[in-house]
Structure formats: C-alpha cells, structure tokens
Amino acid sequence: MEYLNFMADVYGVGAQERKAHIEKYLALFELENAAGEQIKSYSRGMKQKLTIIGALVHQPPVWVLDEPMVGLDPRAAHILKEEMRKHCEKGNTVFFSTHVLEVAEKLCDEIAIIDKGHLVAQGTLEALRSGEKGASLEQLFLELTESEEKQA
C-alpha cells in the first residue's frame, strides 16, 4: 500500500479518489489480500500488477505501457486488455509496446512497427496489409523488417 500511496502522492490524487481507485484496482487484479505484505515477497506477476495499478491510480487520459502483459497470468492479462479497451472506448488513448503481435492485432486501432529504433510502418492493420489480404501482423512484421535489413 505504501507504494500505491506514494504513486498517488506523486500525482496529487486526493484521499477519497485515492482510496476508491486503489481499492478498485486491487480488487480487479485480485491483490486485496496481499496489500499489506512487503513487495519483496510478491511474485513477478504480483509485482507487474502492482506496477500497473501504480501507473493507473491517477486515472491518466493517456496510458503509456511498456510490455504490460509480461509476467501476468492469463486472467490478469485478460483483465488488463479489457481495461485498455474500456479506456479507449471513453475516448482516451493507450500506447503500449508488445512482442506478442497477436495481442496488438486484436487490440489496436493503429499499429506502429519499430525495428532497431526506426519507425518502419504505421497505420491501421488494414492499411498496413495494403493488398495482402489475410496477412497476419506477424507476417507483415517479418516482411517489413527483413526488407529493412536487406536495404542496410
């Protein structure tokens, strides 16, 4: 709880709002029973959930998440994906990085492919396919990054 209160302090979250958001996310990610324990006793997945809660406790309109599914169990990953969808449905934005291209394919309205620090392609999945009907994001990624390597 100290970590989450610290994160709320950093963002100036008031006492009532803080309590409500922390309770909501602890319940959502099934961490209520572990809230009083030291973080060093947490598993990798529990630490990841706690980090996510800390990032969301101030309800930012834009979420920037780096590999947010790493370490999460399937239930927690599903919950996070649903929260990301709900956030976007409210007119907000979620930027997230992932190496699991199927997740990006299912969740994203816009996709950016970055290879060795360079933006290789950006747009909707349909636009990126541009004539390659049925091409998966994985196939597109491999084609785009391979051609970049050959050009170098």
For the regions a language model picked out, list residue spans one by one.
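ABC transporter nucleotide-binding domains
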Residues: M1-F96, L101-D115, L119-A121
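Hydrophobic aliphatic residues
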Residues: A8, M84, E132, L144-T145
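Short C-terminal domain-edge/linker segments immediately following a structured domain
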Residues: V94, E126-A127, E143-L144
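Conserved beta-strand-loop-alpha-helix hinge in the C-terminal portion
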Residues: H118-Q139
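ABC-family P-loop ATPase nucleotide-binding domain
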Residues: E148-A152
